[in-house]
């Protein structure tokens, strides 16, 4: 069964937060009671993503069919591909008072991101994000539901002619979202503060082989389509050969405190953002575990507000935001929702799904 959306408002915020943290308390014996670092023991993490669980047998059959030369019944429910990434992180930088202006949480991999990838690709309930379909919306227990049409976030079939983009905010150093989700979109822009970017680029380059479905071009990573050796008298380029589609992948600095897209003169400072507008018909902004204290909430929401206005008015893009929160402070979660809904006038939906509710995470769809 697909996830449902609970439309939150200034009254139901508190009901939602109370219920979610009550659920969390009831599962305290099953869930790790830590801050959410994926693994603090090592500088290099080896992580595998693969189909698993109750549908394992069915997925394995799909994998075997994919390897045949005949027509492929690509997944309509869950992804069939597996991925293995090697992530270099810096525990010492996390605890440093000198690195990146004392903003150091991005130097390690936090567990929200791997959980989100597994849920998005392999959970049957996340199918609307893979298929692009209507999702039931409720406004609380006393409200009849209606449906919200969602564009595809990830096209697993490769048959959809729509152009999709992902803009990642607060990416951190791991680079695992672009090298995995980049397989299913046309443009991916990964952003964070300037001090994070070199390690982010290193991890992306280390795991570039996981872009199994795409050829990757990137100005920031200095990646170009290779030229194939001449055959006879003809010069043939890789772009002219029937092969994988192309992913535009960029890494860029984006400071939430300084961004000002209302000033047209500053647009030239963000060519990567313009790339999304110029190449895509829909964009999902993805932000995983970026709301962990109250001081980040206003800069983050102001940035979303500017991005939404600019991308919709300039390029007429379909604009959606997915925010993943590791449920730590109930006060911070409540304040984030209050500000997003009441002060910044966003439409915010709680993604209601059993797999998520059995975790320490929550995901919100913002439009």
UniProtKB/Swiss-Prot annotation:
Its EC number is 2.1.1.-. It is an enzyme of class 2 (transferase). Keywords: Methyltransferase, S-adenosyl-L-methionine, Transferase. GO terms for molecular function: S-adenosylmethionine-dependent methyltransferase activity. The keyword Transferase applies. The keyword Methyltransferase applies. GO terms for biological process: methylation. S-adenosyl-L-methionine binds at residues 110, 170-172, 192, 256, 288. Residues 58-68 have a biased composition (Basic residues). One of its GO terms (cellular component) is cytosol. Residues 55-74 are annotated as: Disordered. S-adenosyl-L-methionine-dependent protein-lysine N-methyltransferase that monomethylates 60S ribosomal protein L1 (RPL1A and RPL1B) at 'Lys-46'. Belongs to the class I-like SAM-binding methyltransferase superfamily. RKM5 family. This is Ribosomal lysine N-methyltransferase 5.
